[in-house]
Amino acid sequence: MTTAAFGSALKRKEDPRLITGQGTYVEDVSLTGMLHIVLVRSPLAHASIKSIDSSEASKSPGVVAIFTGEDLKEELGSLPCGWVVPDTKEVPHPPLAVDRVRYVGDAVVAVVAESTAQASDAASLVDVEYEELDTVIEMDDALADGAVQLHEDAPNNTAFEWEVDAGSISDARSSSDVAVTQRFVNQRLIPTAMENRGVVVDYNSGTDQITMWTSTQIPHLIRVLLALVTGHPEHLIRVIAPDVGGAFGSKLYLYAEEVIAPIIAKNLKRPVKWVESRSEGYLATTHGRDHITDIEIIGNRDGTITGLDVRTLANMGAYLSLIHI
């Protein structure tokens, strides 16, 4: 006797391995000779980088190398937007900031050491001098006349305007009985998956092969985008998504760390690991929502809807990654 596929309670098969601690997450991946990366991040939302002094950090125990955006800018490329709509204003997005930071948590320096603790200790010794610039917090303020401009290539702090138009809304208004309007404020949120993001990279200099373990929802797209950003041949990149401890959509992107780690592994000819702390994740992992939507529903007293006028402002942050509305 067989069990019907529909309308029956099917026993899950994946749970025992995970709830008994036999899963394999990025943090569980350990390779011989592996180094650890800690990133120095901007405490300011908008600032010019005046100087970076890593002399004391380089003397710290266990430190193997320290990289700035200036050091790696030719190799790191620019992070792309995963999906662009017509007339999107794409701006350069360096994985390690060069000259200017544009959000709290923007990565500025990568410290590489024999252990995470040693890299963290050394990172605390890196001295970055900033010149703080004006900021905007609310979307209405960002669009106001005279607002500080985050990117020269995106005037009025607007990445794109996407219009979908079918029929005449003015005709619907004039020929209908009633119109109801409402503003909806969809608050910003932080996904906070159980497993923080993490990356392990092994580079084989003999074959030029990059193998990456990363906590992601899109391993195939990560490979495509990584090849695009770094110029490394796609057929020489292998991306492995091991067990992923949640995401809520926050692991649908190519992140800066997924570009920084393979470039450092290639430079040092040793495996590297980066795993974010929980507090770091609040700064460096994408947030969600943060929309303001004004809706007008036009219709007749018999319940027929004759028109719908929807205008949405979406806070995309400092850079586009994957447009979602």
What are these regions (language model features)?
Residues 148-230:
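Helix-loop-helix junctions that connect adjacent transmembrane helices in secondary transporters/permeases
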Residues 2-3, 74, 91, 118-138, ...:
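Gly/Pro-rich active-site capping loops and adjacent beta-alpha segments
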Residues 39-70, 109-129, 199-268, 314:
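Alpha-helical support elements that line or immediately flank enzyme active sites
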Residues 235-242, 270-279, 306-311:
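Beta-strand segments within the central parallel beta-sheet cores of soluble alpha/beta enzyme folds
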Residues 32, 323-325:
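Conserved small/polar residues in nucleotide/adenosyl-binding loops
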Residues 11-12, 29-33, 93-95, 100-105, ...:
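Solvent-exposed alpha-helices and their adjacent loops that cap or buttress functional pockets
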